[in-house]
């Protein structure tokens, strides 16, 4: 009888644990979304060419001239780039 109770309890625990793992897998990872759906991109993430506001925060600007990467990626802004982004009035954080 003890064996049956332990086995039943183990199956319930296993079922609950596997459901929580499936829920985590179903959640959409924000980095997997295209930049336009995220609202803004973090540093070293793809961004929209010519749009510094597509990078999150005042520290990020869109850089399309990286020597080792194709495409545009957010990078840390220099002092002048930070000022230019501030005056653009970007809405993201």
UniProtKB/Swiss-Prot annotation:
GO molecular function, one term: toxin activity
Tissue: Expressed by the venom gland.
UniProt family annotation: Belongs to the neurotoxin 31 family.
Keywords assigned by UniProt, alphabetized: Disulfide bond, Secreted, Signal, Toxin
Cellular component per GO, a single term: extracellular region
Post-translational modification summary for this protein: Contains 5 disulfide bonds.
Localization: Secreted
Signal peptide: 1-18
Residue span(s) of the pro-peptide: 19-38
Protein name per its UniProtKB record: U12-lycotoxin-Ls1a
């Amino acid at each position: 009888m003890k064996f049956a109770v332990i086995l039943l309890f183990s199956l319930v625990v296993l079922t609950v644990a596997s459901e929580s793992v499936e829920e985590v897998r179903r959640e959409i990872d924000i980095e997997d979304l295209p930049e336009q759906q995220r609202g803004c991109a973090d540093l070293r993430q793809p961004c929209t060419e010519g749009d510094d506001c597509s990078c999150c925060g005042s520290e990020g600007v869109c850089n399309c001239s990286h020597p080792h990467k194709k495409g545009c990626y957010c990078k840390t802004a220099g002092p002048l780039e930070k000022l230019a982004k501030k005056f653009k009035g970007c809405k993201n954080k």
